[in-house]
Amino acid sequence: MITTHDIKNPDAYLRPSFSIKDKLRRLTWSVCWLILCRWTPNPLHRWRVFVLKCFGAKLGQNNLIYPNCKIWAPWLLETEEVVTIGPGVELYNPGGVYLGHHSILSQDAYLCGATHDFNSSEFTYIKRKITLEPYVWICAKAVVLPGVFCAEGSVLGASSVASRDLSPWSVYAGNPAKYIKERHNFLLHS
């Protein structure tokens, strides 16, 4: 059999992306969330905030964290005050996630903070921070990809995919997300 692989060098696709220590930390977190939070009634937001803080999350006041959301690494999550992480939201945040005040992640939204370089023979793992400024709304089932910066007041419509930065006080929709229209900046007119 003829092969182009270097037998002495193990296949890059089979190498782990994370250390055993990291995997054990995330396993501990997942089990604790399952036992302490996943089953809790929706109104117990403060309890879930407390548990997240015990695992290193930096959270502002009056956050609404729903029990069936999935946060990959709470120690890489930072929020300001009055942030909503809704039902079914998934934060895959190996590069970190920052959520500005009054930002909302609606049901089943997905923030994906990592990918792989598919052009590399090493299939290199790439992680990027996702940032949402204040008053950003990520609508139901929308996806935000690695490294995307959502500027103040931007909206990503339902089931849309943001692969590029979102401009301030603008509405985006589609896959890939495209600018639709301006959002009324209620901060200037209140």
Show the residue positions of the predicted features.
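Short-chain dehydrogenase/reductase
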Residues: 84, 137, 155, 161, ...
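Glycine-centered loop/turn positions within well-structured domains
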Residues: 97, 160, 168-170, 178
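Flexible, glycine/small-residue-enriched loop-and-beta-strand segment within the central core
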Residues: 39-49, 68-80, 84-149, 175-176, ...
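Terminal amphipathic alpha-helical/low-complexity segments used for targeting or macromolecular assembly
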Residues: 1-57, 61, 135, 153, ...
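Beta-rich strand-turn-strand
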Residues: 140-164
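Short conserved AdoMet
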Residues: 60, 149, 167
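Short alpha-helical DNA-recognition segment
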Residues: 63-66
